[in-house]
């Protein structure tokens, strides 16, 4: 029976950083993607410089640069998942996708018996510690990518159509990101709302893509990617993290 030192709930750069510096770690992620905080929600196209201080952080940074994901003050967040997967494969860090922790029980010897659900059914992972790296913030927005022949008109109309929304340039020229605040809706109900509203627009803005996940604000958890603006910074926060209790 294999016993891990740490089981991390939630895949991300902090999780990978922790796993890189703590070899007996396994990561469980409910979704089918690895970069769930930057890539999936298209969290930001503005690059915030960060210089890594660890060998692993430098290697991850090197992979990002090899794909030209950081250019000037912008970042191509669309390529983050590919870069992240390259690093994880290279380091052979254990990650279980579509894996959800459904229960946990502390045995008499102090080992945690975590029951997890995967595509193959229920199974058990035994670990000394669990870290929950998921963000619990209720402050969330949904990112909508669009193009417009008259960008000025679109940037004026969209924040009025979607109350509290903001518009920022995306990585590729001529594309923009609309950040729509989400209140009382889940990922399934908010998309029909977006589509319906979009049909009433008059500026000619063309919807390209709706992010499959919400963009969340950091909730103070140092093991949440959402607490950081740069993926390399998030990675090193996990790499140097030495928390003793479950987060």
Task: Go through each PLM region and give its residues.
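Short glycine-rich, low-complexity/disordered patches
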Residues: 72-76, 202-216
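Generic structural signal for well-ordered, non-membrane alpha-helical segments
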Residues: 53, 57, 73-81, 187-194, ...
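C-terminal catalytic lobe of FAD-dependent flavoproteins
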Residues: 208-247
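N-terminal Rossmann-like FAD-binding beta1-loop-alpha1 element of flavoenzymes
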Residues: 2-27
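Conserved N-terminal/central alpha/beta ligand/cofactor-binding core
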Residues: 24, 29-103, 139, 144-146
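Predominantly flavin-linked oxidoreductase catalytic cores and closely associated redox partners
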Residues: 95-205
């Amino acid at each position: 029976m294999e016993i891990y030192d740490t089981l991390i709930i939630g895949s991300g750069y902090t999780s990978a950083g922790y796993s890189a510096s703590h070899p007996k770690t396994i990561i469980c992620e409910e979704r089918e993607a690895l970069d769930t905080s930057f890539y999936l929600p298209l969290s930001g196209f503005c690059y915030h410089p960060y210089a890594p201080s660890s060998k692993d952080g430098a290697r991850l940074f090197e992979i990002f640069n090899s794909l030209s994901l950081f250019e000037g003050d912008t970042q191509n967040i669309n390529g983050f998942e590919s870069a992240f997967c390259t690093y994880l494969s290279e380091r052979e860090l254990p990650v279980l996708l579509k894996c959800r922790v459904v229960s946990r029980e502390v045995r008499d010897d102090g080992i945690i018996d975590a029951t997890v659900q995967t595509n193959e059914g229920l199974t058990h992972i035994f670990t000394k510690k669990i870290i929950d790296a998921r963000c619990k913030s209720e402050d969330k927005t949904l990112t909508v990518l669009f193009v417009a022949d008259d960008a000025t008109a679109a940037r004026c109309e969209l924040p009025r159509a979607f109350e509290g929304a903001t518009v920022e340039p995306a990585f590729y020229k001529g594309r923009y990101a609309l950040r729509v605040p989400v209140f009382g809706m889940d990922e399934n109900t908010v998309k029909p709302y977006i589509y319906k509203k979009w049909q009433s627009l008059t500026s000619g803005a063309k919807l390209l893509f709706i992010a499959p996940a919400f963009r969340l604000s950091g909730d103070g958890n140092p093991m949440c990617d959402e607490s950081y603006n740069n993926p390399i910074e998030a990675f090193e926060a996990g790499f140097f993290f030495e928390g003793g209790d479950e987060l």
